[in-house]
């Protein structure tokens, strides 16, 4: 009887292992589906869809590699003579096909960026950059970065941490990223983190971009700012204005040019960056420092929120109205219409003089962004581009999810190359005196 019990036990273990293989394969396939399929209006579940699709897609090479190792190890240990293995292998093969489609689009991002830059700036825009600075630009893909997607530090960068720019405790601090090589009057890149205006930290986002640009000779600044719901909007925008003022007053000590600042950010940070570019010296957001110049020389906005009011009805069933009213502005549109309007970048486009003084902009948006809908960003670009005095570059990336460039991946690599080209072009334009 003991022998029979042992046989039954082995059969149970075998069945469990067989089922485990199928379950892992099913989960892998579901994750791949979230990466390639655009799903948005599903309530709060959209956050889970975004997160799984984002991680799976941008780490697709790692996912495929680990799954291949898993299948190979299973074959060596458990064999292939089961129905469960056949089903599981079918699911894995489907997963790899979907991730291969995703990778194809990610690897094509370089061509998308190139077309967007040339359409907006001209075919020969790189020739406007000095030979010395052009040598810093690359269009190569660096596979070494994909091997370590979360390794950001570079030997040519030193850090000055936790400098206060306003009296808001830890939320009023910023970090300065400085090239190790000595220099002065370097271009400045000011990073504003995202996080739905409620979460986020100066050390968490845009690390690939900051390190790439600082290593090539820029000075980077990354800020904290007050968060909702403790601080209602527009406190976040006021802090961005204060940070710009701090940079203009202090960045020369770190080798930066106080007269040249490009502000960048993604999501809520992209929203604040666009507002910074469209509202220089807006008195309502500069109480106590009304006479400070808060103009910037460029805006690099990724998947930015462009409308707090859903004025065009694009979102339909997935309106942000309740979230904005309860958590961010903490007043309804009826109670505070001016705050909603002023807080919507799209509302500034047709105000007198705004399009004429807006700096060059580079807006990047993914078609499969679950949190910021591509149709809203398209509408913003379509409204501003024809009337803007300065060039507006818009790159729309197939299958790209929210926060796609947060760590190293093939698509992030293409983005860094394109951002470097554009930033150097804006800097060259400024040096020629073509913008204030």
Regions found by a protein language model. Give the residues of each.
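Alpha/beta-hydrolase superfamily serine-hydrolase fold, recognizing
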Residues: 14-436
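Short, Lys/Arg-enriched N-terminal segments with co-localized hydrophobic residues
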Residues: 1-16
């Amino acid at each position: 009887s003991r022998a029979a019990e042992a046989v039954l036990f082995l059969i149970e273990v075998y069945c469990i292992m067989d089922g485990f293989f199928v379950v892992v394969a099913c989960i892998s396939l579901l994750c791949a589906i979230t990466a390639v399929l655009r799903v948005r209006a599903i309530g709060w579940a959209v956050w889970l869809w975004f997160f799984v699709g984002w991680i799976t897609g941008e780490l697709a090479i790692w996912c495929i590699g680990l799954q291949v190792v898993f299948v190979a190890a299973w074959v060596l240990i458990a064999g292939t003579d089961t129905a469960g293995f056949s089903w599981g292998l079918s699911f894995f093969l489907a997963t790899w096909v979907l991730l291969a489609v995703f990778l194809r689009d990610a690897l094509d991002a370089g061509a998308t960026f190139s077309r967007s830059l040339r359409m907006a700036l001209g075919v020969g825009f790189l020739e406007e950059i000095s030979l010395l600075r052009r040598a810093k630009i690359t269009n190569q893909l660096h596979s070494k970065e994909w091997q370590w997607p979360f390794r950001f530090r570079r030997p040519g960068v030193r850090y000055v941490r936790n400098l206060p720019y306003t009296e808001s405790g830890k939320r009023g601090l910023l970090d300065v990223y400085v090239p190790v090589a000595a220099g002065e009057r370097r271009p400045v890149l000011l990073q504003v983190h995202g996080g739905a205006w409620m979460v986020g930290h100066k050390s968490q986002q845009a690390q690939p971009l900051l390190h790439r640009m600082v290593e090539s000779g820029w000075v980077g600044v990354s800020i904290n700012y007050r968060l909702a719901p403790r601080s209602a909007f527009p406190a976040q925008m006021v802090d961005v204005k204060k940070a710009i003022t701090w940079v203009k007053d202090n960045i020369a000590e770190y080798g930066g040019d106080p007269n040249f600042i490009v502000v960048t950010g993604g999501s809520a940070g992209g929203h604040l960056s666009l507002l910074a570019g469209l509202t220089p010296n807006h008195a309502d957001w500069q109480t106590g420092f009304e006479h400070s110049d808060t103009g910037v020389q460029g805006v690099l906005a990724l998947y930015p929120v462009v409308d707090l009011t859903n004025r065009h009805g694009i979102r339909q069933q997935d309106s942000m109205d309740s979230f904005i009213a309860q958590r961010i502005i903490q007043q309804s549109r009826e109670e505070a219409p001016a705050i909603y309007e002023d807080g919507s970048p799209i509302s500034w486009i047709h105000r007198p003089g705004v399009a004429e003084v807006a700096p060059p902009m580079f807006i990047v948006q993914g078609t499969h962004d679950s949190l910021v809908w591509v149709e809203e960003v398209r509408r913003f670009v379509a409204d501003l581009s024809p009337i803007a005095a300065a060039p507006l570059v818009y790159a729309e990336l197939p299958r790209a999810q929210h926060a796609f460039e947060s760590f190293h991946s093939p698509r992030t690599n293409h983005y860094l190359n394109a951002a470097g080209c554009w930033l150097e072009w804006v800097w060259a334009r400024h040096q020629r005196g073509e913008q204030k």
